């Protein structure tokens, strides 16, 4: 039983390691994307974003993980999808979870 609890605790800690950004601090186009996706997030969904420019959409990445049953999974998938976009667009800034 204690092994199971340790595993769950490590998953929670891993989920908390992602940096977070307030939606108000995002560039306008990312704020719009956030507002469009926010109602669909449900209890566990998360979105992540990265940007090197506040005006050039080609220097922005945005991804959400919506249909999941665990918050840690949603966080991890949102960051993963954002990182894929970030790499494809050569964005230097790290992906951050949006709160």
Could you tell me what each predicted segment is?
Residues 7-9:
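N-terminal signal peptide c-region/cleavage motif recognized by signal peptidases
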